[in-house]
Structure formats: structure tokens, C-alpha cells
Amino acid sequence: MVDAPHSKCGTFGYVGSSPTAPTLMNTYTRFDISFKKGNGCWLWDEKGKKYLDAVAGIATCSLGHSNRILRKKLSAQLKKVQHISNLYKIEEQEELSKYLTKQSCAESVFFCNSGAEANESAIKLIKKYGNTVHKGKESFILAAESSFHGRTLATLSATGQPKYQKGFEPMVKGFKFFKYNDIASVKKLFEELKANNQKASGILVEPIQGEGGVIPGDKKFFKELREICNKYNSLLILDEVQSGVGRTGKMWGYENLEIEPDGFTLAKGLGGGHAIGALLVQKKANIFTPGDHASTFGGNPFACRAAITVLEEIKRRKILKNVLERGNQLNEGFTKISAKFPKIISGIRGLGLIQGLVINDSYTDAKTITLKAFDKGLLLVPAGGNVVRFVPPLIISRNEINILLKKLDLIFEEM
């Protein structure tokens, strides 16, 4: 999962950023700018300055800004019904669930409103599974170091970065952490649990770590994770809040790893800029019964229509092909730029249109580069590990990638 902008750990905590109205709680530090118009991959501020957006609302605006088809479909939906609650059947929700299950390994879907809510749902599901299957034994949820799963107390407890947890202790009990892409670390945890007559009810893990530094999952590691979960009767749930819905060039992040999880979570790009989250599960994990979980707004007709439209447009416009092509173009450009500026760039990571430049911290930092990009009319966002993150709309064109690379080259040239 990828984090929302915050000040405590510095995603947007820039020097010179401006506080907003005193009527807003002080949870963010923001740029002193307000965008008034958007179209495709571009935004315009109140002074008319144009920006190429490689943030996309933090990997959210899949179809770009002010998409014509999305506007048309949502306008029509508002003329029908936008919210009625889950006391009643919702046709749009059923349509979306069929679309999602047809295209994935899942058989059932629970809808909510965000990535944190989707991961909270996954945590509850894993806990119920453990209490059902491993009766009488203390069980734990395993998660990765450097992960990010959300800001609710349970998802924060599942996040393997103590800096986010500081000040909110005690964390929810029942989580243990392993090193990402290190199967020996996972096996050690399972052996320790077995020795203590304890169980792992499930593993919650990202197929590509976003906030942790744009770190792709290793195929061999995930295949062994799948085998271990099968052996110990533990669920394998993937957090695809950031990597799902085409971001990596595959429809789902797990497809890059050549495995099938027992479930996975979605949000961000699913609604194309509109709030929706989802937990998708296979038969083994389809254990919720009425009363186990709920969401007032989850799966409302408006949000579901947005998601249906996003999925339809991805298919109609062959957007996955564009993500792969533009991702390759971006990577090739990064390779040339890193060769030109080896003192600044120490690595390139990512898949499709979630990529990161690892910045040599002895030279500068990701925040500084992001600020300089802002001045050049390019919107970027940092990630952990001194990484500059690139998550543009999935519709970005060849010419727009070239513009991005030229701006980036100029930024490094001036440093």
C-alpha cells in the first residue's frame, strides 16, 4: 500500500510548505498551491501554471483528470441513485463484483471506502480464520518490515515501520514481522511459533512495497510464501491497494509473481479518483457471515459506477499495453539519466507505472528533488529509502513521458 500525504514522517513535509486554514486539523503539511483545473495528465494552478502530474493523487487517478467517459457515467448515475446503504440489493455493486471476480482468482468481494478499510477488513478476516481453523491456539498475523498498510490502529499495527507508530502505542497485539523478500526470515518465524505451540493465521504482504521504497516482490520468495501458507494452513493475503488495477502492467500485482493469493485488497486506482476499497477472496477465505463486518458507504452505487467505468476503460482502451510500453520507456529513460548522473542516482526500481529512482543520500535527498521538480512544473512524490516515486495516470502518453524525462534531466543538470 502507499501512504497518504503526511507531516510526521515527511512524505510532504517540505520546507516552505504552507499551513492551511486553522479550521482544518493539523495532520498535513502541504504545498502553498491550489489546483483549479485538470485534464488527462496535467493540472493547472490558480495562476494558470501547468504541471505534468506523475503523482496522480498518489497512484489513484488511473484515467487521469476530468476523464470524459467517467464524467458522463457518473453524471448519469447521480440522476438515478448515489447511495442507499447495504440494507438493500445494489445492482451496481453486484455488477462490479462479477466484473472483478471474472477477471481475477477471487470468488467473492467485500466493498468499503479506502485502502486502510480494505486492509482492516483483511485483518479481521485473517483473525476469524485463525480462530476458526486454529482453535485453542494463540495465532498471529505475519507482515513485512518496511511495509505500509494504513493509518487505522490495526493497519498501523500491521505496518512494519516503527516511525509511523510512534506516539500511538500500544499497538494492537498479534503481529510479527519478517524481512521482505527474505524467505529464511519467514521460516524462522513459523519455526518459533511452532516451538511455542502457536500458529500463523495468515500473512499480509504487498506484492510491491510502495511507501517502503518501491521494492518489487521476488517471484521465488512469493512462491515459497505460498507453499509455506499451504503447509501451515495459513491465509496469504496481498495488499494491492497500490499495485492492483493495472499499475504494474498486469491487472493484478500477484500476476507478476506467478502465484494466486487466498485474497487481496484494492483501493486507490479502482475508483479513478473516487473513494472505493475492496477485499477479494477465494473460496478458502470466504468465511465472513452476516454481522461479521459492514460498511455504511461501502459499495454505494456511485462509487461502484466509477469502478466499473475504470475497469471498462482499461479494457476498451487497452491501457495495460500502454502501462507496459510507457513503463519500459520510463525505465529506459531512467537508465540513461542514471548513467549521466551516477553521483545522484544509485538505483532504479519498479514495474510498469510504479517506479522509483534511488537517490544517493550522500549527495541529496528525494524531497529536494521533488521540490525542484515542482518548480519545473513536474509533480513527484517521495517514498521511503530516499526514493523519488513516479506513479502517473495509466493513460500517460509517449510524448508526456519524454517531457517528464527532459524535465528530470534538467533538474539533475542544475544540481
Curated annotation (Swiss-Prot):
N(2)-acetyl-L-ornithine binds at residues 151, 295. One of its GO terms (cellular component) is cytoplasm. Pfam families: Aminotran_3. The modification N6-(pyridoxal phosphate)lysine is found at residue 268. It is an enzyme of class 2 (transferase). The keyword Transferase applies. CDD domains: OAT_like. Pathway: Amino-acid biosynthesis; L-arginine biosynthesis; N(2)-acetyl-L-ornithine from L-glutamate: step 4/4. This is Acetylornithine aminotransferase.
